[in-house]
Amino acid sequence: MTQKRNIADYNSRLFNTGRIRRFYHMARFDFVADLIKRRKINVEQFLELGCFDGRLLQHIPQPDHYVGIDANVEGGLDLAKKNYIDDSSKVFIESLSPENLLTFESDSFSAFASLETCEHIDPDQLDAYLDEVSRVLNGDLIITVPNEKGPVLLVKKLVKRIIGSRSDPYSLAELFYASIGRMERVARREHKGFDYSRLVDQIDHRFELISVTGLPFQWLPPILNLTVAIHARSRMTSVELDG
């Protein structure tokens, strides 16, 4: 059985270790909060995939009903359940399969978010997750993922090597192909080989694509940023179009 990380240490490393690291990781939460406020997104019925310890709830208006789904590999879901044990409007579900979304009725959520999670999902399962999300969602979708291609990848690999941080192993050929965006030549393993452009296409196939934004520097194109944020909306049904 895989040993779960110490959650306090994990959060401290992400959000309290140096200004630069905190700025990078907080950018996605700040983006979601700002987008919800600016677009007046309805968050009354909120679904989150990869919720970890429920940190996003600290940055958005409180939903009337919130469902957080997580694989709980790192123990974050245990902490979320403990923190919200007395709040019946918050439901946390441990899940490793898109089949768990089958229990929800169609159009039962007004907003969906998934932060730094899609890159960890098996590519075959990701399609199934998006199919189910498109069914249960009648509203806005917000997804953030890391940028694992282009010149940014070379910078990230160099920084991780300098600071001695753990990183997915690339062959020299894979690193070259990833740096020029030839992701089909890179073996896929979680972050490694993940192509945000393919995810954008998958979302565009199922939703009305609103924007693709680079983070943390929104004035730079996504390919030159560390993180990519995708905003989309449920397509209008024939009934809504007729109305």
Label every model-predicted segment.
Residues 32-153, 228-239:
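Conserved SAM-binding loop
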Residues 243:
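Short, cationic low-complexity segments
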